[in-house]
Amino acid sequence: MKTKQSEFDIVIVGAGLSGIGAAYRLQNNCPTLNYTILEGRSAIGGTWNLFTYPGVRSDSDMYTFGFPFSPWKNPKVIADGPDILNYIKDTADKFDITKKIQFDRRVISSSWSSKNKKWTLKIGNNITKSVEHIKCRFLYMCSGYYNYKEGYTPDFPNIDSFSGKIIHPQHWDHKLDYTNKKIVIIGSGATAVTLLPILAEKAKLVTMLQRSPTYILNLPSEDVVANFLKRILPAIIAHRISRWKNILFNLAFYNACQKWPKTLKKFLKNRIKKSLGNKYVDKHFDPKYGPWDQRLCAVPDNDLFETIKNGKAEIVTETIKTFNKKGILLDSEKQLEADIIITATGLKVQMFGGMELLKDDKKIDVSNQHAFKGVMLSDVPNFFVAIGYTNASWTLKCDLNAQYVTKILNYLKINNFTVCVPEFDHENIKTERLLNFDAGYILRANKFLPKQGDKSPWKVYQNYIRDLFSLKYGKASNEYLKYK
């Protein structure tokens, strides 16, 4: 979008799922406010525009991962990346959001002025290489939680000695020909289990090398109940029923994992044993932690297990001693020969797309701030952030956040306030890490993530029903949220 406008009521940063969802809530609930969306890339979609590796797909069902106001019409509920990208684009077009997006605009810094009660954004234009400035009363960060420029790769010994190709899935080489090649995928998360079946269709052998096992749940790629409802009900009604069905099921399953971890662990292992047998599962699918202590991976239609069963792929559970010319030497002295090594070793967590945050020309250390309802940060005025769930679809929480943000904006307008800022009670509320989650990328990031408190409204509960009443149906007024 080409515009000379340099001041807005609100600026949304990021044109992915959470950014488009925030824009919809904003223009529906606060129609008098003018806004723009700044997107650092040249296209809409966020994650789903960036990740293009073979087989990329959601690891959540699309009824909870997608927009509640835009029906998911595809019969596949565990959806392919290109279909998700088209869904985001179509939704943005349908609700006239696309025209509000300024592409190729990377926010370098955002500085709050207490005197002017406004944010000033310093923006890098990727096309002209020039620096632009925009002012706004409110800033809403929907830029995700990881570094788009590079993924995380551990410091593997002698990695440069390998004579073949090394690829991180975040930046896939589409010219890569892996036909009849030996491929080693390092990792056991969602990306690794997604890549394995699709690569095995052409490769000679695909080996998934994992340091330790992960919980994996087989799910049907199509939701039979949802597809039936689509045939007999209006699309939006069928979508809402299917969404609530899956929200409640996923929440019940998560709570069951927390309450009866041994029983649910046995249940998950037994489902895999039907395909791979006891010995294979006990060695490669027996995590040392409880179900949902880390994110549980979903695979559609048994594709991972069937590929292994058919001999086109294998799992090796060992640790790396060193890379060498032929591949990887394990600590057991076993050699894994490879033509291609894929480092599906995770993300680099990054807050606000690397943007510098300032208040009255002083840099704000985000790690010293506390998250208010997972929507705002303590002592940072007129600043909102989309923080999602780690135990469910990330975007479920982002949509509730957006609805609460619009409540705050309307409360400000009705009461003739211009500023809102959360103030943390250091004397009576204890500090905890923001995400009580043991995934590697979260543990690496704790040192620069904001904190949470040990009680409401400073505690992030990871519970949709609780957040529904707190955010969608809760009041904008709060003793810790100061309006001026």
Spell out what each predicted region is:
Residues 76-147, 322-323:
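Feature captures the FAD/FMN-dependent oxidoreductase FAD-binding
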Residues 13, 133-146, 183-186, 328, ...:
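Short hydrophobic core segments
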Residues 399, 403-484:
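C-terminal active-site-capping segments
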Residues 275-330, 334-337:
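Alpha/beta-hydrolase fold catalytic core
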Residues 72-90, 102, 186, 256-264, ...:
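Short beta-strand to alpha-helix junction loop
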Residues 8-12, 17-101, 210-211, 274-279:
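Beta1-alpha1 glycine-rich phosphate/pyrophosphate-binding loop at the start
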Residues 2-7, 11-13, 17, 22, ...:
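Rossmann-like dinucleotide-binding core of oxidoreductases
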Residues 44, 344-412:
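Glycine/threonine-rich phosphate-binding loop and adjacent beta-strand/alpha-helix elements that clamp
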